[in-house]
Amino acid sequence: MPHTSLQVVRIPKALWDELVAHAREEAPNECCGYVRVKYGTAEQVVRAVNERQSPYGYELDPKSLFAANELDDEGYEVGIYHSHPRSPAEPSQTDINLAGYPHWTYLIVSLQNGNEPVVRGWRIADGRVDEEPVVIGD
C-alpha cells in the first residue's frame, strides 16, 4: 500500500488520560491497544492484551487486531498504541520492523519522564518513519 499523507491526530483529554492510565497500570511492561479515529479525532480507546507481556515489546492479541481491522474496513481511521515505560515516545527498530499497517497511525506513550508522560504519533511504512502531530485537548 502506498505511503499516505500525514495528518494531525486530535486526542481529547479524557482519552489521553486513558492512554496514560493504561501505560501506568501495565508498567513495567508495555501496554497496547487501538484507537478508533474519525476525521482525525480519536473517539474511543480500546485496551488490548499484550501477548508478549514484556517491557521491551508488544503484540496485540488476535481478537483486538481483528476488531481494529474491522474498523478499518468500516471506513474509520485506526491508531495502534503502545507504551515505552523507560524510553522516549519514538519507534524502536523493533517497532519499525513489525509495523504492518502503513496507513494506520502508531501512537507511543512514553513514561520515561515519570509525571510528565508524552504521547506522539507516527506513520510507519516500508521502513520509513514520519511523525504525525498529536494535539491533546477537546
Regions found by a protein language model. Give the residues of each.
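Conserved, mostly hydrophobic/aromatic
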Residues: I80
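Conserved beta-strand-loop surface patch within small alpha/beta domains used
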Residues: M1-E77, R86-D138
